[in-house]
Amino acid sequence: AYEIRLSLVGSEMCIRDMGADVIFHAAGASGMGMFQAAEEKGFVAMGVNLNQNSIAPDYIMASMLKKLDSCAYHAITSIVEDTYTGENQMLGLSDGGVDVTVEGSNIKVSDDILAQLDELKQKVISGEIQVPSELN
């Protein structure tokens, strides 16, 4: 595990050296090495799956959330309403399946940026912005 962490930190440093301002990992708990590297090297990171902001609040700006509570609610509701098909279901912003949070971060995100983020989220929900998916 230590060797893997070292290679991941090396990758993060390489990405940072190439000019990235913010590094987003997509590996859940295995992103811990990236957060440690963010603290050691002073770059900004983003968490994923759950709110990871409190892990390193001075270095994690935001977290992308997979809202499993909402997913479970949708699944249970479909079973109760006898509409469950057993097929894969994709939940996104409009269904409450995913979201983003800055809660717990000490990095100040301006109200202007938060408003832009909300506007973009609404455009995704309305279909004005199409998010590609390998599942469809």
Model-derived features: positions:
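Glycine-centered small-residue hotspots that permit tight backbone geometry or close packing
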Residues: G10-S11, G31-M34
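Single conserved hydrophobic/aromatic residue that forms the stacking wall/gate
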Residues: A1-G10, C14-D17
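Solvent-exposed loop/turn segments at secondary-structure junctions
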Residues: G28-M32, L50-I55
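Extracytosolic ligand-binding ectodomains
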Residues: I15-V22, Q36-A45, Q52-N136
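Redox-cofactor binding/interface segments in oxidoreductases and associated redox assembly factors
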Residues: H25
